[in-house]
Regions:
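Bacterial N-terminal signal peptides that target proteins for export
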Residues: 1-14
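Expand to "…catalyze enediolate/carbanion chemistry for C-C bond making/breaking, isomerization
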Residues: 28-282
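Bacterial N-terminal signal peptides
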Residues: 12-22
């Protein structure tokens, strides 16, 4: 290679490096822009380290639901302790499908058909009560997402038409947007908390505060109760999952409040308060 050729080669190499340094950031920005943002806004807030609160819907009331859902992060549809049916929840979600609060259901059980019905009607979160062991946690996770990560089957419910809009491919995005919440409510669950929280597909572990007090026999003010709360907290964070408590009064003023992110009920996002039940003074 002549001296002139060597100079040309060196200059060409420098130009190529300079060009790549200019293009690379542009390509990175393009890839970031192409990555879809979660339409599960409640989950997005959790991933950003924020607390989320809900309104509990325990009866069929389309107008009431559509009003309350304007003001909260998510709606906690209560099926464990109510007579609500899936068709009721389906109708409420359909009436105002893109209201602010993300629909989630506390299931009566973690059987396949419960979770399949819930996901097909359009919820973006399932809450599994009274999880004592890994097997029940696995059931909750297994039926909530599509293969290859889980075993949800492909149904024909309204979920696709609700969330598969504006160019969004529901089947390709729902796994990331789904939220699987596990409730620990017994001393047995406390003992197994780390293994439960470590189950793949479990996103959030919350304490069922009232039932934990009932099943343990310790008042929530008892140090032994608080030790159980601390163990669940520590095990959940050690497993890399999000921690929460059903009792929203633990959102502030408690030693673990800074780490507690997911709550049943609590303050609305804009100061709105639900109307008092008939016959009860607000």
């Amino acid at each position: 290679m002549t001296k002139t050729s060597s100079i040309r080669w060196a200059v060409g190499s420098l130009l190529a490096v300079a060009l790549l340094s200019v293009l690379a950031p542009q390509q990175g920005r393009g890839q970031d822009a192409a990555k879809p943002k979660l339409y599960n806004t409640a989950k997005q807030k959790l991933l950003e380290g924020k607390q989320i609160f809900s309104f509990t819907q325990s009866k069929m009331d389309i107008n009431g639901y559509c009003e309350s859902a304007k003001h909260y992060d998510f709606t906690w549809f209560e099926m464990q302790h109510s007579t609500l049916e899936f068709k009721d929840i389906e109708a409420m979600i359909a009436a105002c499908p893109h209201v602010a609060a993300i629909p989630m259901i506390r299931l009566p059980d973690a059987q396949e058909w419960h979770i399949q019905h819930a996901t097909d009607i359009g919820v973006l979160g399932v809450i599994v009560p009274t999880v004592d062991d890994v097997d029940r946690a696995r059931e909750g996770a297994k039926w909530s997402r599509y293969p290859p990560v889980a075993r949800r089957s492909s149904g024909q419910g309204q979920a696709r038409s609700i969330w598969g809009i504006n160019g969004i491919d529901y089947a390709k995005t729902i796994n990331d947007n789904m939220l699987v919440v596990i409730m620990i409510e017994t001393p047995t669950g406390v003992a197994n908390a780390f293994d439960i929280a470590s189950v793949p597909g479990v996103d959030v572990v919350i304490i069922g505060n009232n039932d934990l007090a009932q099943f343990s026999g310790y008042a929530q003010t008892d140090d032994r109760y608080q030790q159980m709360v601390t163990k669940i907290h520590d095990d959940t964070l050690r497993a890399g999952k999000i921690f929460g408590q059903a009792n929203w009064t633990y959102a502030t003023g408690h030693p673990l409040s800074k780490d507690a992110k997911f709550f049943q009920n609590g303050p609305s996002n804009d100061g709105w308060k639900p109307p008092a039940p008939a016959g009860r003074v607000p």
